């Protein structure tokens, strides 16, 4: 299977975290401790199967946060193979662009995936060997309420035919993990999708809609259904408080 070959997971953690700052937090969001562990650990434990399969983890951070010592220590503790760390001087025009910087530093012919730093997924639900050999894209999704997500619409065969940002075209809301056949493919897709300023939505360059350009070119994209109860959102102070008060079963299981 294509997905079983080790590649690079790009962790985009270069946002401002302004909601946490306004709530009184003084450290970067990913360092905030919940149930005895930093949010960084809670987010990355959902990728244990990729870690065990030998994938590298690359990171995009903000230079002013001097995150490298923290990353080095946490990756060593978690058994993660640490790849490049890119320090950005400011925010980019979207996650797609932040991930592009990491794609440029990755093995161009190996699989490439992007994940955020504010979502918990129960360990072992996301597995590289579950990605079929013929796929060009793979997007884990869950049935989440509301329209504040990216959404994937599938046909009767289960193939993705459309992806939209914060437009509820289906019940398949993405969890924020985006897999691509290769880093080179991600870079080429980025250039095509955002050529001449096209593809920018509300001033931002999102990853999910990039799959529409992949599909239009004949690429095959499928989703993975993830149980809603096994996902915990960590993107806002309110979500973190809810996670601490009632962690998903997969999170409770890791606490022993």
Language model features with spans:
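Conserved N-terminal catalytic core of the sugar/cofactor nucleotidyltransferase
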Residues: 1-12, 19-21, 33, 37-114
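Short alpha-helical oligomerization interface
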Residues: 27-29
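Conserved alpha/beta core of the MobA/IspD/sugar-nucleotide pyrophosphorylase nucleotidyltransferase superfamily
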Residues: 2-9, 173-256
